[in-house]
Amino acid sequence: MFGGNMRIFEVMRETKETNIYLKINIDGTGKYKIDTGIPFFDHLLASFAKHGCFDLIVKARGDLEIDDHHTVEDVGICLGLALNQIEKRNIFRFGWAIIPMDDARATVAIDLSGRSYCVGNYEPKREFVGDLATENINHFFESVASYGMLNIHYEVIGKNEHHKAEALFKAFGVALDLATKIDERKGVISTKGEVKL
């Protein structure tokens, strides 16, 4: 799961609200071990890892007695911090995916640009799917973009909220897998000569 000459990043974050450990192998095979205390969120992160072919470990403990906001937010922050460690030379940089799931379809486009921006149109019709507050899905992606210094655009259509959310996380994984692919021809993919703030 983790070994060899691979791009592996590890983040730990502890606050009064949460305690998060996250480890991701960008060059993995889609193995995962996830426990956030929010089973449907675990399912979404597993879908991201599996379809992006990332090996992912997430151990999170948060103030779920209040609600799930801080846990979802801080996992997003940790994933963003991990992704921000990716060497920007010799990667594809851009990634995109259109993923259907029954009635739902999600489109994701990302740019590992060194600039954070998140634009999404996920508008849930239900307050919860399982034990996850659906409003926190948008906040998760905002947190990833902000701390990962990447640009994320996403659109979701469909009827079933489970399908919409799962298609979105699958599409994010597939798009990120493409963006992080090694391509020795590319060097730094910017007319500025660098990808950072």
From Swiss-Prot:
Gene3D superfamilies: Imidazole glycerol phosphate dehydratase, domain 1 (3.30.230.40). One of its GO terms (molecular function) is imidazoleglycerol-phosphate dehydratase activity. Its EC number is 4.2.1.19. One of its GO terms (biological process) is L-histidine biosynthetic process. It is found in: Cytoplasm. The keyword Amino-acid biosynthesis applies. Keywords: Amino-acid biosynthesis, Cytoplasm, Histidine biosynthesis, Lyase. GO terms for cellular component: cytoplasm. It comes from the Archaea. Pathway: Amino-acid biosynthesis; L-histidine biosynthesis; L-histidine from 5-phospho-alpha-D-ribose 1-diphosphate: step 6/9. PROSITE patterns: IGP_DEHYDRATASE_1, IGP_DEHYDRATASE_2. CDD domains: IGPD. It catalyses: D-erythro-1-(imidazol-4-yl)glycerol 3-phosphate = 3-(imidazol-4-yl)-2-oxopropyl phosphate + H2O. Belongs to the imidazoleglycerol-phosphate dehydratase family. NCBIfam families: PRK00951.2-1, PRK00951.2-3, PRK00951.2-4. This is Imidazoleglycerol-phosphate dehydratase. The gene is hisB.
